[in-house]
Amino acid sequence: STAGKVIKCKAAVLWEANKPFSLEEVEVAPPKAHEVRIKIVATGICRSDDHVVTGALAMPFPVILGHEAAGVVESVGEKVTLLKPGDAVIPLFVPQCGECRSCLSTKGNLCIKNDLSSSPTGLMADGTTRFTCKGKAIHHFIGTSTFTEYTVVHETAAAKIDSAAPLEKVCLIGCGFSTGYGAVLQTAKVEPGSTCAVFGLGGVGLSVVMGCKAAGASRIIAIDINKDKFAKAKELGATECVNPKDFKKPIHEVLTEMTGKGVDYSFEVIGRIETMTEALASCHYNYGVSVIVGVPPAAQKISFDPMLIFSGRTWKGSVFGGWKSKDAVPKLVADYMKKKFVLDPLITHTLPFTKINEGFDLLRTGKSIRTVLVL
């Protein structure tokens, strides 16, 4: 048995920004109290991982990225009660401690134990790391770090799921799908018959489209500058697709003309401040709701006309789709098993873990929606 011992395994280490991932042998320490060590089976490539590579999201280096995954518990530290070796799990970049004000509130989901701040530590709760490589300490990423054969997470940052679930599919419930789907159902609470606009048609944006359809929206306007994304958006429920490049005027004016007075709900699923204000301006001046789903770039500030808000609009943010992670993830997996939603259309590529750099190239060139790496 490997329990209680250091495991040597393969991991993709990012030594510095704007460099390819380096496949290295790393040492993964055993889990401490309240921690679990997980054998990662499948992990998705999300734009937020790439934001660290480009420097748009500030993280301490060197680091093992990856946060959208599924795996099996290899061993548990002392005092762990809810998980045991052999359990199928999804790591949670938004943990659920069950004790902080966000966890205790019916309205909240962003647990205080998260490492998503503008100055992340990249460390476990005790201020240390479980990864070393070539004698150097390697940082964790938002409490998950899934671009490795083995990782260690806090027990509040792993959800036990149905062991029959296909891990190479449900790994998307660890981020992309849940983030988009929940932004509609949990954060915006879209009503039947509504008109919605979705800015950005990557994996998360398409999950927003699916959420709008599930909520009964009558018009779902999908917006992207890459027209190759439109067929998939329509397949998943978009009623119209708009390419801002086809117009001389700002996209919020186009949407206002298309809908009369603006959409009921808009979703920014890109992470650009320009599209955040466009999305806000495109919703109804008095009762429109706009939700920021894309991770905002580090150190950039928004300036906008406050009259956009004064007239009655609501501007909201949504992290992990507003779901209380440990409670919701097992239910979302169960819903997937009951065929209440699909994940296959989001997964355009499945690659062996060693081809991680190729997977990121597919993302950057707009050729993929989700690439799943199989370990």
From Swiss-Prot:
Signal sequence, start to end: none
Required cofactor(s): Zn(2+)
Coiled-coil annotated residue ranges, if any: none
Binding site for Zn(2+) 1: 46, 67, 175
Binding of NAD(+), residues: 200-205, 224, 229, 293-295, 370
Group of enzyme by EC: oxidoreductase
CC cofactor note: Binds 2 Zn(2+) ions per subunit.
Subcellular location: Cytoplasm
GO cellular component terms attached to this protein's record: cytosol
Record: residues binding Zn(2+) 2: 97, 100, 103, 111
Record's keyword annotation contains Metal-binding: yes
UniProt main location, coarse: cytoplasm
N-acetylserine carried by residues: 1
Record EC number: 1.1.1.1
UniProt catalytic activity: a primary alcohol + NAD(+) = an aldehyde + NADH + H(+); a secondary alcohol + NAD(+) = a ketone + NADH + H(+)
Domain of life: Eukaryota
Claim: RNA-binding is one of the keywords in the record: no
GO BP field: retinoic acid metabolic process; retinol metabolic process
Pfam families, alphabetized: ADH_N, ADH_zinc_N
Keywords associated with the record: Acetylation, Cytoplasm, Metal-binding, NAD, Oxidoreductase, Zinc
Single annotated GO MF: all-trans-retinol dehydrogenase (NAD+) activity
Sequence similarity: Belongs to the zinc-containing alcohol dehydrogenase family. Class-I subfamily.
Quaternary assembly: Homodimer.
Protein name (database record): Alcohol dehydrogenase 1
